Swiss-Prot record:
Species for this entry: Homo sapiens (Human)
Protein name per the record: Mini-chromosome maintenance complex-binding protein
Gene Ontology, cellular component aspect: cell junction; cytosol; nucleoplasm; nucleus
Phosphothreonine: residues bearing it: 160
Family as reported in the entry's similarity comment: Belongs to the MCMBP family.
Keyword Endoplasmic reticulum part of the UniProt annotation: no
Task of the protein: Associated component of the MCM complex that acts as a regulator of DNA replication. Binds to the MCM complex during late S phase and promotes the disassembly of the MCM complex from chromatin, thereby acting as a key regulator of pre-replication complex (pre-RC) unloading from replicated DNA. Can dissociate the MCM complex without addition of ATP; probably acts by destabilizing interactions of each individual subunits of the MCM complex. Required for sister chromatid cohesion.
Length: 642
């Protein structure tokens, strides 16, 4: 069995060792998974695995062991592949069994040929996910992962920087002149496809249903390949992820950490184009029908590498400062949580002061911003999401950079965020809702395809008079549904499919927001800096990195604390609410009680308390009273509704 760092540089050799020992006995697959699982438990082993998020693709060796932090953007149809196949040596007639798992290209000797009629060939199924880097991931998160990674990599001799930078058009240019490439793979790498597994053998073609493709000249070579990122300006690799076990556990928009084998073999581009040419000759009509689908589902490996997953973990969060799984009863995790909780009070006080300065001296608005940032949908009762707390910060100065810089502050605190500038042009032209493209058989992303716990900051101060067209109205409706029901209805043309979500929405506006919000707090600045950018920059630079990290841990950790209300406090709250209704029957409603309970929940958690106390309930009532009084005062000043 290979040892040392072979599991990192030559994982297929490890797999081959288990396969050779066990043959067709399926136990070898479990042993492979167990082997890599144990390897990753060794001291700091995950930090030695090169990450596609941090390491340029051209620095990674093909067929090496890699990891990838990503979101499932789409799920393709399951595909069949040859789990075990047999080859025959043309000279000696010797038969050899090979495994097809974790491979796109079957490696055969120059004298070997695939025996399609072998009774020992087995066809298995695997699932393909289209995965993209986590949308809106903050710069500080990326930097922390980069600094933690200890993988030693250098430019791959078989994968040069020029390949990495080549566009989709260049890939097709290469494929239009395949002789230069094919000469490198002559004999041992003649193209073929059986059951989803590309294979090499003698120079002859084998066509199956899986290889029915497209005409090369039907491609739109003038436009670059669309990596289908949900948010504009996103960078990083998209990957086709091949999953072999337990794929039913995952769903679209899940955040995953994957460990697997990288496949970037240039021969994949040659094979795909050969299949297009061959299928065009066999059935031009069928080829035309599937051209776009073939382009999307089989992009050049230099642009969209493949990862054959050995281990996959669904991530609760992407904050690199915390243990990956906070629900585990591991001593290390418990020790981390208890240690941080013991110093929670000063961290909260410092964070409140920091946000008070960011909100121009308004400590009440800072309190509500903290409550908003730690809120989360903890459960659903029928269609009602419980725990969400959308805040509308009204009174923001118009034609000012305040909202832009406030978003920068939030970016420095949360792991993932996006600022939506709510202009008429953006509302009318941006794609908010993901939709199904049946021609390409893929889910085309939209701005609202975001993973759980993303902070979405909607800036209404940029909104001017204008006309919303039909797409604009649909986009406003989508935002309203997201805020109210924490769901996005994806467009599948013939029907809509509901995707539940857990997005923290924070709205900045001059007057009352056009969108529904759980809570409106009117900003009362205590100071107006002459230079907003200079003020906010000095605020950020004054905070020590260690303190900033404590803020980040605080805001992520508190979302995952269990919370409950005792029977005694429940009875006290009910009695209190009845008394409030007696005193003010017109303005106190059941919705007000619900909001008070949400505020009390977040307030308790912000103090590290996992159960509601009488003291926190009274403090929640006090905060709500101050907020309502402020709104009434502002309404009297303006003479209109806020």
């Amino acid at each position: 069995m290979p040892c040392g760092e072979d599991w990192l540089s030559h994982p297929l050799g490890i797999v081959q060792g288990f396969f050779a020992q066990n043959g067709v006995n399926p136990d070898w697959e479990k042993k492979v998974i167990e082997y890599f699982k144990e390897k990753l438990k060794e001291n700091n082993a995950p930090k030695w695995v090169p990450s596609l998020n941090e390491v340029p693709l051209h620095y990674l060796k093909p067929n090496s062991f890699v990891k990838f932090r990503c979101m499932i953007q789409d799920m393709f149809d399951p595909e069949f592949y040859m789990g075990v196949y047999e080859t025959v040596n043309q000279n000696t007639k010797a038969h050899v069994l090979h495994f097809g798992k974790y491979r796109d290209v079957a490696e055969c000797g120059p004298q070997q040929e695939l025996d399609l009629n072998s009774p020992r060939n087995t066809t298995l199924e695997r699932q393909t996910f289209y995965c993209v880097p986590v949308p809106g991931e903050s710069t500080w998160v990326k930097e922390a992962y980069v600094n933690a990674n200890q993988a030693r990599v250098s430019p791959s001799t078989s994968y040069t920087p020029s390949r990495h930078k080549r566009s989709y058009e260049d890939d097709d240019d290469m494929d239009l002149q395949p002789n230069k490439q094919k000469d490198q793979h002559a004999g041992a790498r003649q193209a073929g496809s059986v059951g989803g597994l590309q294979w090499c053998g003698e120079p002859k073609r084998l066509e199956t249903e899986a290889s029915t493709g497209q005409q090369l000249n039907s491609l739109n070579l003038s436009s670059p390949f669309d990596l289908n990122f949900p948010l504009p300006g996103e960078k990083g690799p998209a990957c086709l992820v091949k999953v072999y076990e337990d794929w039913d556990c995952f769903k679209v928009n899940d955040i995953l950490e994957l460990y697997g084998i990288l496949s970037v073999d240039p021969v994949l581009s040659i094979l795909n184009n050969d299949e297009r040419d061959a299928s065009a000759l066999l059935d031009p009509m069928e080829c035309t029908d599937t051209a776009e689908e073939q382009r999307v589902h089989s992009p050049p490996a230099s642009l969209v590498p493949r990862i054959h997953v050995i281990l996959a973990q669904k991530l609760q969060h992407i904050n690199p400062l915390l243990p990956a799984c906070l629900n585990k009863e591991e001593s290390k995790t418990c020790k981390f949580v208890s240690s941080f909780m013991s110093e929670l009070s000063p961290v909260r006080a410092e964070l409140l002061g920091f946000l008070t300065h960011a909100l121009l001296g308004d400590s009440l608005a800072a309190e509500y911003l903290i409550l908003h940032l730690i809120s989360t949908v903890y459960t659903r009762r029928d269609v009602l999401p419980l725990g969400k707390f959308t805040v509308n910060l009204s009174g923001c100065p118009r034609n000012s950079t305040f909202t832009e810089h406030l978003y920068r502050i939030i970016q420095h605190l949360v792991p993932a965020s996006f600022r939506l500038q709510m202009t008429i042009e953006n509302m009318n032209h941006l794609k908010f809702i993901p939709h199904k493209d049946y021609t390409a058989n893929r889910l085309v992303s939209g701005l609202l395809q975001l993973p759980s716990n993303t902070s979405l900051v909607i800036d209404e101060t940029l909104l001017e008079q204008g006309q919303l067209d039909t797409p604009g109205v649909h986009n406003v409706t989508a935002l309203s549904n997201l805020i109210t029901w924490q769901k996005v209805d994806y467009d599948f043309s013939y029907h809509q499919m509901e995707f539940p979500c857990n997005i923290n929405v924070f709205i900045t506006s001059e007057g009352r927001s056009l969108l529904p919000a759980d809570c409106q707090i009117h900003l009362q600045p205590q100071l107006i800096p002459p230079n907003m950018e200079e003020y906010m920059n000095s605020l950020l630079s004054a905070v020590l990195p260690s303190v900033l990290n404590k803020f980040r841990i605080y805001l992520t950790l508190l979302r995952f604390l269990e919370y409950s209300i005792s029977d005694e406090i429940t009875k006290a709250v009910e009695d209190d609410f009845v008394e409030m209704r007696k005193n003010d029957p017109q303005s106190i409603t059941a919705d007000d009680l619900h909001q008070l309970l949400v505020v009390a929940r977040c307030l308790s958690l912000s103090a590290g308390q996992t159960t509601l106390s009488r003291e926190r309930w009274l403090r929640a009532k006090q905060l709500e009273s101050l907020r309502r009084t402020r709104l009434q005062q502002q309404k009297c000043v303006n003479g209109n509704e806020l």
